[in-house]
Each structure stands twice: as structure tokens, then as C-alpha cells.
Amino acid sequence: PIAGSMVLAAILLKLGGYGIIRMMQILPTTKTDMFLPFIVLALWGAILANLTCLQQTDLKSLIAYSSISHMGLVVAAIIIQTPWGLTGAMTLMIAHGFTSSALFCLANTTYERTHTRILILTRGFHNILPMTTTWWLLANLMNIATPPTLNFTSELLIMSTLFNWCPTTIILLGLSMLITASYSLHMFLSTQMGPTPLNNQTEPTHSREHLLMALHLIPLMMISMKPELII
């Protein structure tokens, strides 16, 4: 069910990050070197999840693995135990909650019209539903963390934190972000471009779907430009 996927990705997946933030308060704050294996594992796990996204043919599986990769960055930022790292992790959890929920919503919009989640069978939607293609483009750009979205702010904070702690981590971070951009563009091109494989009548999009997407994406830009809205 699409509602379950949206709640799972937006809220329940972030409970792990919240639990780590709570537990880190009772651990020593100065000895971050002892957490080095966990930080490396978190970044390496993010890269492996991103590589798994590249070979997915199921749309919902691709979005789910994308959520896992972003949580790797959150864990790495929390473990370093700096104010910037904590701020970046919390901001990324909020931003990715909106983004992944929006992507699952778009995947359901596509599924309701094609009755399949296979990428190669959902292509050509830019000819049929151009407004939905616009929402897909915006959601994927936010997943890549382009400015002026909250995703960009959070990943910038996390990159600064990790680079200050250990400059070598920028290699793993850069590789992770490169793969994220690759599978996000691959997802967009696979679902929207190319010839349409459908021969039947496609139902047009409804106002509620456009409203739902607007309520997902507008807060990401508003919070990034005016963070005092939630602080």
C-alpha cells in the first residue's frame, strides 16, 4: 500500500537515527576515534545501497534502497558528535522524509496508470502526463540535493563535518553522491522519456495528486530559505 510506504520512508525509517542521537548523549564526546569503524561502515553501506539502486528494475525497490543510502550519511554525521554533524543529520532526516515520501507518491501515480512497477514498462509519460513529469524532475533533483532545497543544506553540513573530521572521507562521500545522481537521473529517464508502451487510454492526473506533490516539495524549499519556520 502506498500510504504504508510513505509513512515507513518518511517517519519510521528515521526512528533509528533518532535512537542513535539519544544514545550518543550517554557516550564519551571526545573519543571519536573509537567510532572510526562505524563511520567507515556507514559510508561504505551508503555506497553499497547506492550501487544496489543502479541495478534495480522495480521502481519502489529503487526508492527504498535510496532511503537506506541516505540513512548511512545520517549515521556517519551523528557518530562524529559535533553540533554541525547533529544539525546536518537532523536536517537530512527531515528533508529525506519529504523527498522519499514524494517519490513513493509518484511511483504510485505511475502504478495506478500502468499497473506495473517495472521501469522499462513505465516509460514515455512525458507525452501523456507532462505535469507529472515536472513533479518527477523536481523530486529527483531534490533527491540529488540541488540548491535551494533543504537536502542541499543538510548534505553540505554533513560534508563539512566529515571533511573537518577526516579529509579522506570526502572520497567516499563524493562517490556516494555521484552514484546518487546517476540512479536518480536513470530513474527519471526510464520512467518519463522514450516511446510509450501503452496502447490503452491513460487516466489524467487529478488535482489531489498535484496538491499532494506541492505539499511535499514546497516545504523543502521554504524551510531551506527560512529555517526559522521550524526552529
Curated annotation (Swiss-Prot):
GO terms for cellular component: mitochondrial membrane. Its main location: mitochondrion. GO terms for biological process: ATP synthesis coupled electron transport; electron transport coupled proton transport. One of its GO terms (molecular function) is NADH dehydrogenase (ubiquinone) activity. Its EC number is 7.1.1.2. Keywords: Electron transport, Membrane, Mitochondrion, NAD, Respiratory chain, Translocase, Transmembrane, Transmembrane helix, Transport, Ubiquinone. It is found in: Mitochondrion membrane. Pfam families: Proton_antipo_M. Coiled coil: none annotated. The chain crosses the membrane at residues 1-21, 34-54, 61-80, 84-106, 128-148, 169-189. It catalyses: a ubiquinone + NADH + 5 H(+)(in) = a ubiquinol + NAD(+) + 4 H(+)(out). It is a multi-pass membrane protein. Disulfide bonds: none annotated. Belongs to the complex I subunit 4 family. Core subunit of the mitochondrial membrane respiratory chain NADH dehydrogenase (Complex I) that is believed to belong to the minimal assembly required for catalysis. Complex I functions in the transfer of electrons from NADH to the respiratory chain. The immediate electron acceptor for the enzyme is believed to be ubiquinone. This is NADH-ubiquinone oxidoreductase chain 4. It comes from Atropoides picadoi. The gene is MT-ND4.
